[in-house]
């Protein structure tokens, strides 16, 4: 029989047996094998005892892709719908305006931010060249910004500008721009980055009823208003919005001090850096380098070049001779005054619709804020910059209303977070610590370089924006205090955006001295309190966009202002010509004796002349007036009339000073110093200044229907024109003007109502769009987040699947190996069964043989016993026989011993006898010898 694997002691070193060690580990018994050598030959060799492990086979991988060479599901990620897809889809849109507006390319910028502050509290974030670090926002000095103002194009002949500067016209007002293009700027509350859909088209005629709430969301600076009037006056081309090159920011950081002085002293209307409108200009790198090298010269040339783009008339430009670095040593009253050029005569205006139709189609970038209708405000400067002391003019105000209003304004403006803050866009070169100096002149500190004042326009076109520029319920008496003529400017020009008050009390006094179109003539506080309640209610934060831009506007608008014709409804005379203005050298402060040098040596009685023209002026002083006429050496010649009705000055308190007079462009009138603070320059207060009870500022305005005396007429003509009319004539003229003002107020209210309706519609639409944008943003973010999560999970599942496949392949390999081993084990078991049967047969044979051997053993045992018995008997017989023989031998031996003993005795006796004989013989011999 043949055996395969018996046990460990019979197994050899076989590979098959080695693989069985895991499942069948034979144990050694230590017993010798009972198999025959022929059976041992059939066994495999005995394996070496070793501990083996179940190992998974490493799958084959592609040497290039390192992927497992097994079939698996393709790991293709799902096509995720990203925000870029929305951007690409939006870029493929081609929206169109109504038939009056031709379709133009759409510029869309979409970006998503996680920060979603309330869109109703955020102002419009314009796309300017600012680099604001909101983490270090408290350390920012907003009055020394590192970003250059968006000036006019640097040079008129620069190749980077796509349009000639002389043919460009800056930002159109909001109501006209709503027809010319649609620019949707998604505020930072929703997307934190603008989604601007921009259209440009042929401008249609603009009616008065198109005054919309865009004035609230898009505050226009003086240059923006002037641009609108420039569009009405001449057919200029609309300037393209061109992005500002990034190098400008770097140049601004390098030459910030230089740019602060030279930044647009004659800034063109195309850029309104004091407000939220920004008309970016394309500046190439070479332009930026030239701007860096020769900043001041470039800024001056820019101002001159862009001023010519407004109108063919020269623009008066003011220059102040002082060094801002030596500001502590400067005496503002000895700076020589503002060297103001003579203003040219105004020119007629053409109907706006006729001129706007001829404007060249250019895309104009405009931004809409569909908030809840707030005037887009700027956040006040960071509180860590230190508080400025109040000016004396603000400190002397008797009325507490401005303080209450300023507290409300401060609370209101303090609401926006630091992320919403918009850094003021003007740069200043004065120290705030100098405001406690009584000799400090805030208007002589270099000023900000802001766009010039606007041209005049019909009153009816702009009345809605007079009191409805904002819609918040908090009315500010301070804003109406410091800009009493702004209402008239808005009624006459319709587009002057009042500067925005920052909300701090110390800043309010600064804004009062720096309001747009303000002169330094004092305004009675009663005039502001007499304003109609409707105006106070609908003039929410008649905020001056920023105090700093306001101060810049005051000086800059006086420097590059094109004097338009005052558009009164029934004006009786035109503005004075260049010959009627004083020379710049005569604007210095001089004593009265030097002024009236021809015999009139006594000082002018200022108090009397100040009270002239007011309701405190009594007819009893006509005698005094006649005395002045009689003894005035200037009356030697016949009086000359430079204008009709030049004596018509207000004699009663007005609702607002600008309700009576139309706004005269600031460049035509210098800043007349306050009576109580500064001495009179060359008798200008004789020419129509009237007494005020407060130190606030008053705008020297041109009347809508009655002209004011020109303060720049020669001294003799001015005094003659002032004194030749009686108080009754002036009262009658003022009454007529007041009636006309009341009519205008009614029109203002009507336009207010229309504006409020449109404004509410815009507010609702803005809220809807804001919510819609927020929803879209949230949906996009959620979708993006879900897709990213799903993508991560899918990648994780794919990795797990791949790992499971690898494990499965290894398990399959291991299982196949185990199966083979199992088959071998089955074969081994069959061999063991066969061996068992063989062993059983052997055992039976062994038992039979054992029985036979036992029988043989018994037989052998009996035979051996018999043999032993016989041997024993023989041994006993031999023993007895030997015993008897031994006894006989012993007796014989004893007998022999006795013989020996007897012989020994006989020998001894013989020897003794021999010895005795010997001795005897010896003795005998001796004796014989002796003998």
Swiss-Prot record:
UniProt PTM comment: Phosphorylation by aurka is required for localization to mitotic centrosomes.
Query: What's the encoding gene here?
Result: tacc3
List the protein's name: Transforming acidic coiled-coil-containing protein 3
UniProt function note? Maternal RNA in oocytes remains in a dormant state as masking outcompetes eif4g to bind eif4e, thereby preventing translation. During oocyte maturation this complex dissolves and eif4g binds eif4e to allow translation of maternal RNAs. Plays a role in the microtubule-dependent coupling of the nucleus and the centrosome. Involved in microtubule assembly during M-phase. Involved in spindle pole assembly by recruiting and regulating ckap5 at the spindle pole leading to microtubule elongation.
Organism of origin is Xenopus laevis
- One Pfam family it belongs to: TACC_C
- GO process annotations (BP): cell division; cerebral cortex development; microtubule cytoskeleton organization; mitotic spindle organization; negative regulation of translation; nuclear migration
- What is known about its subunit structure? Found in a complex with cpeb1, tacc3/maskin and eif4e. Interacts with eif4e and cpeb1. Competes with eif4g for binding to eif4e Interacts with ckap5-a; two molecules of ckap5 interact with 1 molecule of tacc3 probably mediated by coiled coil domains forming a four-helix bundle.
**What GO cellular-component annotations does this UniProt entry give?**
cytoplasm; protein-containing complex; spindle pole
Q: Which UniProt keywords apply?
A: Cell cycle, Cell division, Coiled coil, Cytoplasm, Cytoskeleton, Mitosis, Phosphoprotein, Protein synthesis inhibitor, Repressor, Translation regulation
Which residues lie in Polar residues bias regions?
260-277, 338-360, 449-471, 529-541
Substituting residue 915 to K results in: Disrupts interactions with ckap5-a
Q: List the biased-composition ranges (Basic and acidic residues).
A: 549-558
């Amino acid at each position: 029989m043949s055996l395969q694997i018996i046990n460990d002691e019979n197994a050899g070193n076989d590979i098959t047996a080695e693989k069985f060690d895991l499942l069948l580990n034979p144990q050694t018994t230590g017993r010798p094998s009972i198999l025959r050598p022929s059976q041992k030959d059939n066994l495999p060799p005995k394996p070496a005892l070793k501990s083996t492990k179940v190992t998974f086979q490493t799958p084959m991988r592609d040497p290039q892709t390192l992927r497992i060479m097994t079939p698996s599901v393709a790991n293709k990620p799902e096509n995720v719908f990203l925000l870029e897809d929305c951007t690409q889809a939006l870029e493929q849109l081609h929206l169109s305006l109504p038939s009056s507006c031709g379709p133009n390319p759409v510029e869309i910028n979409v970006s998503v931010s996680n920060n979603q502050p309330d869109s109703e509290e955020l102002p419009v974030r314009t796309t300017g060249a600012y680099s604001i670090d909101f983490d270090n926002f408290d350390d920012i000095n907003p009055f020394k910004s590192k970003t250059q103002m968006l000036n006019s194009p640097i040079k008129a002949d620069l190749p980077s500008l796509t349009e000639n500067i002389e043919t460009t016209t800056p930002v159109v007002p909001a109501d006209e721009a709503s027809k010319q293009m649609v620019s949707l700027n998604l505020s930072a509350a929703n997307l934190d980055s603008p989604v601007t859909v921009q259209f440009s088209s042929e401008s249609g005629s603009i009616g008065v009823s198109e005054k919309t709430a865009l004035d609230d969301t898009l505050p226009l600076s003086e240059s923006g208003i002037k641009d609108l009037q420039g569009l009405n006056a001449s057919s200029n081309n609309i300037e393209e919005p061109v992005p500002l090159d990034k190098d400008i920011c770097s140049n601004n950081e390098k030459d910030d001090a230089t740019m602060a002085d030279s930044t647009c002293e004659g800034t063109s209307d195309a850029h309104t850096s004091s407000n939220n409108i920004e008309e970016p200009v394309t500046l190439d790198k070479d332009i930026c380098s030239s701007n860096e090298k020769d900043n001041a010269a470039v800024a001056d040339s820019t101002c001159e070049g862009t001023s010519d783009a407004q109108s063919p008339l020269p623009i008066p430009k003011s220059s102040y001779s002082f060094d801002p670095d030596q500001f502590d040593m400067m005496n503002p009253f000895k700076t020589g005054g503002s060297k103001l050029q003579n203003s040219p005569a105004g020119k007629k205006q053409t109907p706006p619709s006729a001129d706007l139709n001829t404007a060249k189609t250019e895309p104009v970038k405009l931004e809409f804020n569909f908030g809840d209708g707030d005037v887009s405000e700027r956040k006040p400067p960071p509180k860590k910059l230190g508080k400025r002391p109040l000016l004396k003019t603000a400190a002397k105000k008797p009325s507490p209303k401005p303080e209450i209003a300023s507290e409300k304004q401060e609370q209101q403006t303090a609401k926006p977070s630091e992320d919403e803050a918009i850094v003021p866009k003007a740069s200043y070169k004065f120290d705030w610590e100098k405001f406690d100096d009584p000799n400090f002149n805030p208007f002589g500190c270099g000023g900000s370089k802001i766009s010039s004042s606007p041209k005049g326009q019909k009153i009816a076109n702009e009345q809605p924006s007079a009191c409805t520029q904002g819609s918040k319920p908090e009315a500010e008496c301070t804003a109406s205090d410091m800009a009493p003529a702004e209402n008239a400017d808005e009624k006459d020009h319709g587009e002057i955006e009042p500067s925005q008050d920052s909300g701090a009390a110390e800043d309010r006094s600064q804004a009062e001295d720096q309001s747009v179109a303000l002169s330094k003539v004092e305004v009675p506080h009663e005039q502001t309190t007499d304003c109609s309640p409707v105006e106070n209610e609908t003039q929410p934060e008649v905020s001056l966009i920023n105090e700093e831009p306001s101060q810049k506007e005051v000086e800059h608008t006086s420097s590059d202002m094109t004097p338009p014709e005052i558009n009164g409804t029934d004006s009786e005379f035109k503005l004075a010509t260049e010959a009627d203005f004083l020379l710049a050298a005569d604007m210095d402060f001089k004593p009265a004796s030097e002024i009236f040098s021809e015999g009139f040596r006594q000082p002018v009685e200022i108090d009397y002349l100040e009270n002239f023209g007011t309701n405190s002026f009594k007819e009893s002083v006509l005698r005094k007036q006649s005395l002045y006429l009689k003894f005035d050496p200037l009356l030697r010649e016949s009086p000359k009339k430079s204008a009709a009705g030049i004596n018509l000055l207000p004699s009663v308190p007005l609702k607002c000073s600008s309700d009576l007079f139309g706004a005269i462009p600031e460049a035509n009138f210098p800043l007349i110093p306050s009576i109580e603070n500064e001495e009179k320059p060359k008798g200008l207060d004789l020419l129509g200044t009237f007494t005020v009870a407060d130190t606030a500022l008053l705008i020297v305005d041109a009347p809508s229907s009655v002209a004011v005396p020109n303060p720049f007429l020669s001294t003799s003509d001015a005094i003659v024109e002032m004194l030749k009319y009686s108080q009754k004539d002036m009262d009658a003229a003022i009454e007529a003007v007041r009636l006309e003002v009341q009519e205008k107020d009614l029109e203002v209210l009507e336009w207010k109502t229309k504006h409020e309706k449109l404004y509410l519609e815009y507010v609702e639409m803005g809220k809807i769009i804001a919510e819609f944008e927020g929803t879209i943003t949230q949906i996009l973010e959620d979708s993006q987040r879900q897709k990213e999560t799903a993508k991560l999970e899918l990648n994780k599942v794919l990795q797990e699947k791949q790992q499971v496949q690898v494990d499965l392949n290894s398990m399959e390999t291991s299982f196949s190996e185990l199966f083979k081993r199992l088959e071998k084990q089955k074969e081994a078991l069959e061999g063991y069964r066969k061996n068992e049967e063989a062993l059983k047969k052997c055992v039976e044979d062994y038992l039979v043989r054992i029985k036979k051997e036992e029988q043989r053993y018994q037989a052998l045992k009996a035979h051996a016993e018999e043999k032993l018995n016989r041997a024993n008997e023989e041994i006993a017989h031999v023993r007895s026989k030997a015993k008897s023989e031994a006894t006989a031998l012993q007796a014989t031996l004893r007998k022999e011993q006795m013989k020996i003993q007897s012989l020994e005795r006989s020998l001894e006796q013989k020897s003794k006898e021999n010895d005795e004989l010997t001795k005897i013989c010896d003795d005998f011999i001796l004796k014989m010898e002796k003998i």
